[in-house]
């Protein structure tokens, strides 16, 4: 549905040249939810704006629904953009218009008959859970409700593609979850192709089928969500995955934690499990093989793309030789082990 080929975007600021995107290629199949994740300034907003030519690429090809957009005339591009809805971090609603009026606006601009506008807007407001807010104004809505209005407006022209530019960044966690569930529901009901950009791996984990990691204007990793979470290939992908697992060292352990081993101290380990290593009884196996005992301090497990992954803090009790051998064995079995110190 979306195919970007060798996209390069260069901005000129006086004598200064800024390369925002460098030879980026991305394919989003029809009906998928595809996430692009990156830090601020990585180029993700520029990338998504190239899809509907809000930013015209310096080089490269933009195909949406089998149509090459970069060669279209202005009138042809305007028509093609009706198939591409877009929502933003800031809702961009017209304060002087009711909820109904905001959603109706693109239909009015397209000279849609009034009866059809009424039918379509009512249908969309029911879809996004705002069937009782027809006559409300944006000032009387919560942030989540405003984004729901923006989603309804973006769907007014029956687009095949929805672009989401940091659509949940301004929302609290609970509202973010509800908006993501709405997008997932719309994707399932309408078969809508969704391309979203974000700096939060929690967003990707919750609804995306595939994910690409962008850094300094280049896509450095892209695959299914389950594959990236199970076998991240780049340090940046690993960092984003770690950010979804929030496991702090308890205060009493922090007070006792030493950088070097002392008499009778034991190593404190941080272990990360992905894929098959999550379900395998690896800790009990190390106890049998190496005569070590693991005291689990805290642990957390989650799912992404149908794959389980988890993190654990433990004390490993045993001789230095046995604990080193046990750690090496765990690493051989796809567990990432970090010695945080000694307690």
From Swiss-Prot:
Q: How does it assemble?
A: The complex is composed of two ATP-binding proteins (MetN), two transmembrane proteins (MetI) and a solute-binding protein (MetQ).
The answer, when asked if Ligase is one of the entry's keywords, is no
Q: Which InterPro entries match?
A: AAA+_ATPase, ABC_MetN_proteobac, ABC_transporter-like_ATP-bd, ABC_transporter-like_CS, ACT-like_dom_sf, MetN_ABC, MetN_ABC_transporter-like, NIL_domain
What is this protein's record name?
Methionine import ATP-binding protein MetN 1
ABC transporter domain boundaries: 2-241
Keywords, A to Z? Answer: Amino-acid transport, ATP-binding, Cell inner membrane, Cell membrane, Membrane, Nucleotide-binding, Translocase, Transport
Q: What is the lineage of its organism?
A: Bacteria, Pseudomonadati, Pseudomonadota, Gammaproteobacteria, Enterobacterales
Q: How does it sit in the membrane?
A: Peripheral membrane protein
- One Pfam entry for this protein is ABC_tran
Catalysed reactions listed for this entry: L-methionine(out) + ATP + H2O = L-methionine(in) + ADP + phosphate + H(+); D-methionine(out) + ATP + H2O = D-methionine(in) + ADP + phosphate + H(+)
Does this UniProt record's set of keywords contain Repressor? no
Give the family from UniProt: Belongs to the ABC transporter superfamily. Methionine importer (TC 3.A.1.24) family.
Gene symbol? Answer: metN1
Which organism's genome codes for this protein? Salmonella paratyphi A (strain ATCC 9150 / SARB42)
Described function: Part of the ABC transporter complex MetNIQ involved in methionine import. Responsible for energy coupling to the transport system.
């Amino acid at each position: 549905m979306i195919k970007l080929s060798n996209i390069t975007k260069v901005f000129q600021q006086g004598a200064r040249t800024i390369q925002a995107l460098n030879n980026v290629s991305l394919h989003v199949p029809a009906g998928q939810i595809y996430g692009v994740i990156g830090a601020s300034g990585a180029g993700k907003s520029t990338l998504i704006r190239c899809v509907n030519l809000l930013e015209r690429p310096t080089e490269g090809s933009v195909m949406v629904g089998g149509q090459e957009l970069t060669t279209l005339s202005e009138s042809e591009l305007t028509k093609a953009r009706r198939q591409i809805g877009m929502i933003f971090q800031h809702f961009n609603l017209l304060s002087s218009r009711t909820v109904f009026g905001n959603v109706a606006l693109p239909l009015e601009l397209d000279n849609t008959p009034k009866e059809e506008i009424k039918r379509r807007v009512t249908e969309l407001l029911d879809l996004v859970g705002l069937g009782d807010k027809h006559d409300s104004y944006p000032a009387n809505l919560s942030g989540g409700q405003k984004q729901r209005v923006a989603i309804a407006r973006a769907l007014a022209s029956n687009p095949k593609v929805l672009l989401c530019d940091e659509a949940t960044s301004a929302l609290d966690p609970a509202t973010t979850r509800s908006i993501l569930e709405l997008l997932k529901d719309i994707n399932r009901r309408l078969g809508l192709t969704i391309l979203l950009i974000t700096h939060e791996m929690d967003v990707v984990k919750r609804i995306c089928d595939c994910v690409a990691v962008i850094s300094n204007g280049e896509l450095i990793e892209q695959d299914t969500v389950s594959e990236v979470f199970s076998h991240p290939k780049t340090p940046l992908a690993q960092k984003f995955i770690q950010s979804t697992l929030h496991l702090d060292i308890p205060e009493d352990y922090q007070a006792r934690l030493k950088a070097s081993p002392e008499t009778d101290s034991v190593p404190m380990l941080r272990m990360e499990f992905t894929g098959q290593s999550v379900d395998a009884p690896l800790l009990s196996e190390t106890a049998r093989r190496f005569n070590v005992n693991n005291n689990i301090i805290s642990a957390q497990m989650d799912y992404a793309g149908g794959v389980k992954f988890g993190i654990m803090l433990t004390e490993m009790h045993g001789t230095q030789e046995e604990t080193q051998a046990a750690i090496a064995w765990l690493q051989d079995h796809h567990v990432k082990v970090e010695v945080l110190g000694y307690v």
